[in-house]
Amino acid sequence: MQLKGFHHLTAITADAPKNHHFYTQVLGLRLVKKTVNQDDVQAYHLFYADGRGNPGTDITFFDWPVGPEKRGTNSICRTGLRIKGEKAFEWWAAHLKKNGVKYKNPVQRLGRLTMDFEDFEGQRLSLVNDESATDFAIWEKSVVPVEYQIHGLGPITLSVPDLAATDAVLTKVMGMTLLKNDDSIHAYKMNAEGPVSELHVRVEPLLPPAQQGAGSVHHVAFNIPFADYPAWTNRLKDLRVPNSGPVDRFWFKSLYFREPNGILFEIATDAPGFAADESMDKLGETLSLPPFLEARRAQIEAGLKKL
């Protein structure tokens, strides 16, 4: 019973149309699910991913009318996006520049070439070299050539003021192992290969606590086999980890809990998947609602802005 890497990462935007343009027309991802926040149906929940919406490739956004994030610790502070090969960095540098996106020159970070940049709201992103990347589905309609397309998430970086309590949760509750560290980053590994399995932790005791807003990350979700869901439910209960209890999101089943610094974690199943209610070739083209919200479709659609 082990984590298979990341499932998705959910962040916050205050401008859904501009967000949609950036992640599809600049980063070249596919909008695989256009739905709403199930706890706040006036807000879009947009899922961008590879060509099939595979777990581990989704970066998702809640659309909330909020001010910008106040950066600090106790937060998820950077999201890695995997690409393959050094030549891809040359293409992406030119592509980002053409689209007016500022970026930093690539550097080696824990042995991988990494290029940092931000979206229009200050969402901190990095392109990360993953030479072994094969676990993604191409998106034929992407603005990005196949050989340079983003393969998925990883690594994802947390900022905490003290490592000890977070380390205990990552290793004793979630079964991660400390892979390596340098002066500023501690890298933890899940049961998969490459950056999709790595959670990085920065220890930054001098920073103030972050305040969420546009440009911040709301939570990170970890991938498990569907069959392991009952066991993970029992594990959190047995270890007395305060959690949400089972939550059915229709496209996957979830468990939510917070690590000791308040950072929200989710455990999410790899099935049923986004094709549960839409054909693969039509993913994300219309508003998709879980069955319990379908009776309110007209009301919900009337309250949403056009993308």
Where are the predicted features?
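Vicinal oxygen chelate
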Residues: 5-14, 32-35, 65-161, 186-200, 239-307, ...
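Core segments of cupin and vicinal oxygen chelate
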Residues: 12-55, 98, 106-116, 158-202, ...
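Residue-level signal for short segments within beta-strands and strand-turn junctions
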Residues: 48-50, 63, 129, 203, ...
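Short amphipathic beta-strand starts and helix->beta connectors
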Residues: 61-66, 138-142, 200-207
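Surface-exposed interaction/gating patches
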Residues: 147-243
